[in-house]
Amino acid sequence: METYVNKLHEGSTYTAAVQYNVLEKDDDPASLTIWVPMFQSSVPADLLIKELASINILVKQISTPKGPSLRVTINSRSAVLAQMPSNFIISANVSLDERSKLAYDVTTPCEIKACSLTCLKVKSMLTTVKDLTMKTFNPTHEIIALCEFENIMTSKRVIIPTYLRPISVKNKDLNSLENIATTEFKNAITNAKIIPYAGLVLVITVTDNKGAFKYIKPQSQFIVDLGAYLEKESIYYVTTNWKHTATRFSIKPLED
């Protein structure tokens, strides 16, 4: 089994983002990606990852209003994992690597092939796209970040378009909007890093919460879902070799 720890926060208390690569234990095993709902922990990361690698995982494919899903049950006797959710549902569209091999409505044990733990800031210092969308009234435009990454092993580059937030803009401000937003975002973002969670997510550390980053606490981490964007690459390969090199911004009017 492979284990990986990504420390994006060094505090004694942190938010744990845990993702597993597992293989079903049956005659025709499917490869699955399992991510655990984020939880708070004060356990040293090196100790937590050891306990995370020793759990038992059961999965069952089900149907929900959101589409095909997986019901996940985690069994552990470790007090260290007391804060970790043990029963939850995740999207099968992101989780399943080999859909045809996964039976419906059958509970199956899994073998853990890899486990990744990312230490993020405490929940009060995390912001998502959904959080910002709820705080924007009468939006007129949306801000898209075009995040460029480079594979340091091959020098290949990929640009991932990520929806950041809706904004409300007056007509008189439209001409200068893009320059203003680009300046604000460049001042606000100190880094961006891909981590394995719900497929993949982008973590942006924000230093300035003016203008486009209003409602985000300074020094907080902004989390953007990428899903299975780079699914053909292994999670470890992506997180080790894909480095953030640049970010451009696009301001688009909302479409009806």
Curated annotation (Swiss-Prot):
The modification Phosphothreonine is found at residue 205. Residues 1-110 are annotated as: Interaction with M2-1. This is Matrix protein. Keywords: Host cell membrane, Host cytoplasm, Host membrane, Host nucleus, Host-virus interaction, Membrane, Phosphoprotein, Viral matrix protein, Virion. Belongs to the pneumovirinae M protein family. It is a peripheral membrane protein. One of its GO terms (cellular component) is host cell cytoplasm. Forms dimers. Forms higher-order oligomers. Interacts with glycoprotein G (via N-terminus). Interacts with protein M2-1; this interaction directs the matrix protein localization to cytoplasmic inclusions comprising viral proteins L, N, P, and M2-1 and mediates the matrix protein association with the nucleocapsid. Interacts with host KPNB1; this interaction mediates nuclear import of the matrix protein early during infection. Interacts with host AP3M1; this interaction plays an essential role in trafficking the matrix protein in host cells. It is found in: Virion; Host cytoplasm; Host nucleus; Host cell membrane. GO terms for biological process: virion assembly. It comes from the Viruses. Its main location: virion. Disulfide bonds: none annotated. Gene3D superfamilies: HRSV-S2 matrix protein, N-terminal domain. It holds the Pfam family Matrix_Pneumo_N. A motif (Nuclear export signal) lies at residues 194-206. GO terms for molecular function: structural constituent of virion. The keyword Nucleus does not apply. Plays a crucial role in virus assembly into filaments and budding. Early in infection, localizes in the nucleus where it inhibits host cell transcription through direct binding to host chromatin. Later in infection, traffics to the cytoplasm through the action of host CRM1 to associate with inclusion bodies, the site of viral transcription and replication. During virus assembly and budding, acts as a bridge between the nucleocapsid and the lipid bilayer. Residues 110-183 are annotated as: Nuclear targeting and binding to host importin KPNB1. The gene is M. Phosphorylation is important for oligomerization.
